[in-house]
Amino acid sequence: MRPKTGQVGCETPEELGPGPRQRWPLLLLGLAMVAHGLLRPMVAPQSGDPDPGASVGSSRSSLRSLWGRLLLQPSPQRADPRCWPRGFWSEPQSLCYVFGTGTKVTVLGQPKANPTVTLFPPSSEELQANKATLVCLISDFYPGAVTVAWKADGSPVKAGVETTKPSKQSNNKYAASSYLSLTPEQWKSHRSYSCQVTHEGSTVEKTVAPTECS
């Protein structure tokens, strides 16, 4: 989903800014997003509170003004960039914007990879212990963000759902898992249960039926 408005910018003292080798890729990233309509270039204010309403024109001077603003720097407190609703903090003295609404920008270091999804029904041993847990394993996806939704007979299920945070695998792709905890009666009272995984706009759904497992 495209952001309605957005900013990539940075106000930082020259001595704290990135060197020329870091500037060019980040500047080109910002200009590419502008060219593809993913980002409306905005000028970061020189002082005071962030003002998302100041737009940058197409003049040469405006493009020059973008030079020092189309930059992204990692937060010194964290290993990876983090977004907040009002922008992106790097050094204490500098405020960098990443889309006005806090949308995360991922710079891909490798090709995208769709997840492999496997859905396991409750085991017979677990059912005998008066429990029923469905396990949805999600592996080999990149970048490392997925959304998981559970359904019973096509209707959303919210209660009893626990999803882990994606973790990096040895192949630099990501894996996660999601669990749906039920009672044996709940498990047997529906025709089917589904685990729906959405990654980068594509959805993979796996379904299991209690009758197939009896």
From Swiss-Prot:
<dbReference type="GO" id="GO:0070062">
    <property type="term" value="C:extracellular exosome"/>
</dbReference>
<feature type="signal peptide">
    <location>
        <begin position="1"/>
        <end position="35"/>
    </location>
</feature>
<keyword id="KW-0964">Secreted</keyword>
<dbReference type="InterPro" id="IPR007110">
    <property type="entry name" value="Ig-like_dom"/>
</dbReference>
<feature type="domain" description="Ig-like C1-type">
    <location>
        <begin position="115"/>
        <end position="209"/>
    </location>
</feature>
<dbReference type="GO" id="GO:0003823">
    <property type="term" value="F:antigen binding"/>
</dbReference>
<dbReference type="GO" id="GO:0016064">
    <property type="term" value="P:immunoglobulin mediated immune response"/>
</dbReference>
<dbReference type="GO" id="GO:0071735">
    <property type="term" value="C:IgG immunoglobulin complex"/>
</dbReference>
<feature type="region of interest" description="C region">
    <location>
        <begin position="110"/>
        <end position="214"/>
    </location>
</feature>
<dbReference type="InterPro" id="IPR003006">
    <property type="entry name" value="Ig/MHC_CS"/>
</dbReference>
<dbReference type="InterPro" id="IPR003597">
    <property type="entry name" value="Ig_C1-set"/>
</dbReference>
<dbReference type="InterPro" id="IPR013783">
    <property type="entry name" value="Ig-like_fold"/>
</dbReference>
<dbReference type="Pfam" id="PF07654">
    <property type="entry name" value="C1-set"/>
</dbReference>
<keyword id="KW-0393">Immunoglobulin domain</keyword>
<feature type="disulfide bond">
    <location>
        <begin position="136"/>
        <end position="195"/>
    </location>
</feature>
<protein>
    <recommendedName>
        <fullName>Immunoglobulin lambda-like polypeptide 5</fullName>
    </recommendedName>
</protein>
<keyword id="KW-0732">Signal</keyword>
<dbReference type="InterPro" id="IPR036179">
    <property type="entry name" value="Ig-like_dom_sf"/>
</dbReference>
<keyword id="KW-1015">Disulfide bond</keyword>
<dbReference type="InterPro" id="IPR050160">
    <property type="entry name" value="MHC/Immunoglobulin"/>
</dbReference>
<feature type="region of interest" description="J region">
    <location>
        <begin position="98"/>
        <end position="109"/>
    </location>
</feature>
